[in-house]
Amino acid sequence: MSLDISKYPILALANTPDELRSLPKESLPALCDELRTYLLNSVSKTSGHLASGLGVVELTVALHYVYNTPFDQLIWDVGHQAYPHKILTGRREQLSTIRQKDGLHPFPWRGESEYDVLSVGHSSTSISAALGLAICAEKEQENRKIVSVIGDGAITAGMAFEALNHAGDIHPDMLVVLNDNEMSISENVGALNNQLARVLSGSLYTSIREGGKKVLSGTPTIKELLKRTEEHLKGMVVPGTMFEELGFNYIGPVDGHDVNELVRTLKNMRNLKGPQFLHIMTKKGKGYEPAEKDPISYHGVPKFDPSNTSLPKSSGGKPTFSAVFGDFLCDMAKEDSKLMAITPAMREGSGMVRFSKEYPNQYFDAAIAEQHAVTLASGMAIAGYNPIVAIYSTFLQRGYDQLIHDVAIMDLPVMFAIDRAGLVGADGQTHQGAFDISFMRCIPNMVIMTPSDENECRQMLYTGHKHTGPSAVRYPRGSATGIQVNNEMQALEIGKGRLLRETKVTEKGERVAILNFGTFLANSLEAAEKLDATVADMRFAKPLDEALICELVTNHDVLVTIEENAISGGAGSGVIEFLMKNRLVKPVLQLGLPDEFIAQGTQEEMHTELKLDANGIEQQIRDYLDL
């Protein structure tokens, strides 16, 4: 249910950027106040990403006020901060549906709006895409302006610097806005810097700067002296030398919460030639005190009451798989001083907060740098240590070459604790962990484990930690099953599954064996009760329990594989490959994720829609058997 827009009289006049640009600039501060309040009141009722959006309200207003969007193209990196952008681009009334099934996408999405130039979700892609757009805009002579907005976390990734380096080399007309909300680059914000930004972005300074370069082009010594003098003057108050050396004209830092100052600076910069870099300072969670004090907790929020000073606590009960992993880390570190835990900027999400505090010398946050994180682990393994890389399934995709080249080829003992495997829910297509079994199963030396519950997860983590080669344990987002966890840890036999239920059906053609990989086990068992089917918990997607498969083939008419991974190339495909190699001809029904990018919705909604809940599994098997 959308909010009553009559309570936001200025925002009501700015449903699109064209309407926004018709407003007098004097009304912009009040518009920002209303936009921030609207965002807070909306997200608190629906859940979603909050703190990032609160921090870029003024920037969003200023960009759409100065630039002729959608003709001028604006790209948001990652997209957590794009809620104000959605509100101002005709989607205000739909904001209450964000991250819900059939609702607004959680991130900028090309299929949703002409104002969303790039579909995003993963970090550090915006500058590369903006550069591609800028190159083509120049070739078409369209006088189209291209802007990329990237955060101080995302810009640390190698891909961002690769794009900056390329842009600085070929010199297209484009603007990169660095939204610095962690004070990690500079604390120089204030009147002096705002004044300097106006001067450095102004036409007089620019014409003198460019004209001087032409005049002095034949006198390199004097030209170099002038360049160094300029750098010295700018360096006294700005940290932009690095970006200048990459070939950008650096402006800033500027107060990112002074909308009129941003408008003035952006107007100056809009017509500058070559690659421009605007550094703004913002506060994540701006305007809502609890979010300002704890931006990490308020990054993604459940439904809550904004009048309370804290978020609602979870009801307890079943632990999450992430918490099971975090407990394992702490317990294992007591015994193993050579355990090294690595995460690419996912400490909270991966359940590593306690470990990072109790074992700070064994904890390494590699930032948003998955490639580096994987090869960092390989170096530790070569040195005789026992690294564990905690990473989301969707982000392991970004370190795939390193997984092969720097870990598997050398058969190094690196364990990957793969969180968010399978469907993640509200974050949609970019975050589904749909492909990890498929892309790891083809790598030699890999061991891939698929725990069915939290106790299995704990034992498999121990198994991987003790294994002498590369291994992976994949587990889903959210709560585990609630069973009693065995604190004593024991390594499982690699490649051995377990038979949990045997059919009593004797009628030929109807004897079904379900081969379960992962946390759909409860659904498989429930369906099996109605079908009187055999159920095997396979445990390992690689290596497969070939002896168990042979036994099931001998005694059953149909095999059914089930996994929360893409059917293409998944564990079920591995079963079929084994059968064909050994001339074991048997009908196999593969259940799993279809050959499509799956949109957002709750995990339960998507499991039901894809017929992977107990009823859906039963029905798919009955349809296959034509019962």
Curated annotation (Swiss-Prot):
Which cofactors does the annotated protein need, by name? Answer: Mg(2+); thiamine diphosphate
| PROSITE patterns, alphabetized | TRANSKETOLASE_1, TRANSKETOLASE_2
The cofactor note reads: Binds 1 Mg(2+) ion per subunit. Binds 1 thiamine pyrophosphate per subunit.
Instruction: Please write the reaction equations for the catalytic activity of this protein.
Output: D-glyceraldehyde 3-phosphate + pyruvate + H(+) = 1-deoxy-D-xylulose 5-phosphate + CO2
A molecular function (GO) term:
thiamine pyrophosphate binding
State its Enzyme Commission number(s): 2.2.1.7
Which cellular component terms (GO) are annotated to the entry? cytosol
Metabolic or biological pathway: Metabolic intermediate biosynthesis; 1-deoxy-D-xylulose 5-phosphate biosynthesis; 1-deoxy-D-xylulose 5-phosphate from D-glyceraldehyde 3-phosphate and pyruvate: step 1/1
Q: Where does the chain bind thiamine diphosphate? A: 80, 121-123, 153-154, 181, 288, 370
Binding sites annotated in the UniProt record for Mg(2+)? 152, 181
Q: Which domain of life is it from?
A: Bacteria
What's in the keyword line of the UniProt record? Isoprene biosynthesis, Magnesium, Metal-binding, Thiamine biosynthesis, Thiamine pyrophosphate, Transferase
**GO biological process per UniProt:** 1-deoxy-D-xylulose 5-phosphate biosynthetic process; isopentenyl diphosphate biosynthetic process, methylerythritol 4-phosphate pathway; terpenoid biosynthetic process; thiamine biosynthetic process
Q: Does the keyword Metal-binding apply?
A: yes
Mind telling me which SUPFAM superfamilies this protein's record contains?
Answer: Thiamin diphosphate-binding fold (THDP-binding), TK C-terminal domain-like
How the protein assembles, per its UniProt entry? Answer: Homodimer.
Q: Which HAMAP family match?
A: DXP_synth
Q: Which NCBIfam families match?
A: dxs, PRK05444.2-2
As for family, the record states: Belongs to the transketolase family. DXPS subfamily.
Q: What does this protein do?
A: Catalyzes the acyloin condensation reaction between C atoms 2 and 3 of pyruvate and glyceraldehyde 3-phosphate to yield 1-deoxy-D-xylulose-5-phosphate (DXP).
From the Swiss-Prot or TrEMBL record, give the protein name: 1-deoxy-D-xylulose-5-phosphate synthase
Identify the species of origin: Aliivibrio fischeri (strain ATCC 700601 / ES114)
